[in-house]
C-alpha cells in the first residue's frame, strides 16, 4: 500500500527508506547473527518498512506486530500478516501502557519462550532468542507521565524492567532496538557533561546503549541552544573512535558519514589517530575542510562557516567586498565597504574575538589538567619525598589557577570547568559518558529517509547482568539519591552531598574510591564536580548514605527525593 498525503501518519515519524534499513543491518549485522530465527516483538511498526527488512535478515520463527494506531497503519501491516504462511502476527494495543506487555506474556503470545521462575540464573542473562524493536519517535512530542516525552518514560521502564525481570524481560534480559527523536536519544546518551545526567547515569548502570544511526548535527550556534562540546574535544574523541573502527576493520559508507566521521576518515587516516590538534590547529583543519566543500556543520561555529562561504564567493566574484560610491565632486572616488564587505568585517572581528577567548580558556584548561595529573601522582606515588615536593608545587599551581580563573567573567569561568570536564571525560580510560565508550560512529540518516521529516535516531540497548546481591529496590534507592546529587552537576562533590542532608559531605571519607584515580577519583574535592561521578564512586556514595546513622529517616523511602523534587507528598513507606 502506498503512503500518500491523505494517509499522512500522525504523531509518529516513519522510516521510509529500505536502503537506510539495509545499511543499518549491514553495519550491525555481525551482532545480529546471534538472533537468527528468534522471536521478535515489534512495537509500533507503523508502515512496516523497518520491520520487513529486519524480518528478512533474521528470518524469525515468530514476529509480533504490536500497533497502537491501527487507524493509520493497519492496512500496511495486514499486507505482512495476511500473506500465506506468514510468521507475522498483528496485535492492537496501547504501547504506552505497560500492562499491555504483561498481557502478551500471560496470553502466551510467545509460545517458544519460557517464563523463568525467581532465582533462575537465566533471568540475569541475555536471552538471544527474543529481540525487541520499536518506534517512539513522536513528533510533535507526546508527553509521558513524569517525563517530558512518552519515549523517555517507556525506555526508562523497559530498562529498569530488565533488572526486575518484568515485561518481556521475564524470559531473561532482552536486547532492544528502538527508534526515538534525537532529543530523546541525546537525553538518554548525553554527548557532553553539561547535559542532564540523572536518568542517563541509571541507564548506564543497567544497560549498554549505542547510537546506531542519527541525522546530521545541528548548526553550532552561540547560546544555550548551541551548547555542545568544544570542537577540539569533539575531534579528539572522534580520533579515538576512528582508531577503534580501524582495529575492528569497520568502515562507514561514504554516503552515511556526517561531518565528524568525514573529518576522521580524511584527516586521521593520514595522521596519528590519537592526535590532539590544539585550539588553533583544530580550527584551521576544520576551515580547510569547509573550504574544500565538505560541510563541517555541527563542528565549525556557524559564524566561521558564514565567513568562509562569504570569502569564497567574494574570491569568485559572486559578491563584492568593496563598491565605488558615486560622487559629484571632481575628486577621485574611493572604494568603500559593500553590505557584504561590512558583514565580512564584522564576522572576522567576531570570530577572532571568539578564537582569542577559546585560546585563553584552553590555557586554563591545560593548567587544570596539569593540576589533575599532579593530584593523581600524589595519590599513587609511594615516594614520600616525591609526594611532599609535588604537594608544594600543587599549592603554587592551585593559587595561580584560582587567580587567573577569577579574573574571567562568570560565563567564561563556567566554560573553563565544562571544557576541562569534557576533556577529562574523553581522555580518561573510564569514559564517564556512555557516548565516549562507543567503538563506532552512528550512520547518517538523510532528511528524506524519515517521513514526515523529523530528527530521528536508532538506539541499541542491551541490559547488563545485575550485580550479585543487588536487589531492584537497591536500584530504586540509587536512582532516587542521584536526584539531589546531580540536580546541579556543576556543584563540587561536597556541595552536592550537602544538598542531600546537612553534614552529608562527611560521607566523602567513607568512600575510598573518591580519591582513587583508577576509579575516577581525585585529591581535591573542590575541583571534583558532581557531574563527573561515575561507577564505583556513585555506588559507594549511595551505600555510605544508606548506612549513615545521621540520615533523615524519611529518606529511607526509595522515592523520597523524587517526591521532594516534584512537590508530591508521600504518606506511605513501602
Show the residue positions of the predicted features.
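Catalytic cores of RNA-modifying enzymes
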Residues: 1-472
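C-terminal target-recognition/interaction regions appended to catalytic cores
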Residues: 2-3, 412-418, 427-434, 444-574
